[in-house]
From Swiss-Prot:
GO biological process: translation
Name recorded for this polypeptide: Large ribosomal subunit protein uL18
GO terms under cellular component: cytosolic large ribosomal subunit
Species whose genome carries this gene: Dechloromonas aromatica (strain RCB)
NCBIfam families: L18_bact
Lineage, broadest ranks: Bacteria, Pseudomonadati, Pseudomonadota, Betaproteobacteria, Rhodocyclales
Superkingdom of the organism of origin: Bacteria
Gene3D superfamilies per record: 3.30.420.100
Function of the molecule: This is one of the proteins that bind and probably mediate the attachment of the 5S RNA into the large ribosomal subunit, where it forms part of the central protuberance.
Length: 118
């Protein structure tokens, strides 16, 4: 049977396959214990159009900890800003098989407040 990681990766593959059928720009989110990452990826070719993470130097100055909801909210607002600068309004949310809860939810809500539609 599956262990926890294999089940998450399976969910991620299924989601990415559905997004690929739509041919939509996707907002891909990844998290670790200490950091959170967000990338806007083009539908064809997998090219990164915009990105933000808690590892960015300008973000690190403002945050004491990169692995909490406050950091996720900051990254959500920043990725929405950078997406608008790249001319992107509509995205598909790819949560990488992670549960829509906690830091993932905080990032998504902040991105929506920043003007991204998904």
């Amino acid at each position: 049977m599956f262990n926890k990681k294999q089940a998450r990766l399976r969910r991620a593959r299924k989601t990415r396959a559905k997004i690929a059928e739509l041919k939509a720009v996707r907002l891909c989110v990844n998290r670790t214990n200490c950091h959170i990452y967000a990338q806007i990826i083009s539908p064809c070719g997998g090219k990164v159009l915009a990105s933000a993470s808690t590892l960015d130097t300008d973000v690190r100055k403002d945050l004491a900890n990169g692995g909490n909801k406050a950091a996720a909210t900051t990254i959500g607002k920043l990725i929405a800003e950078r997406a608008k600068a790249a001319g992107i309004e509509q995205v598909a949310f790819d949560r990488s098989g992670l549960q829509y809860h906690g830091r993932i939810q905080a990032l998504a809500e902040a991105a929506r407040e920043g003007g991204l539609k998904f």
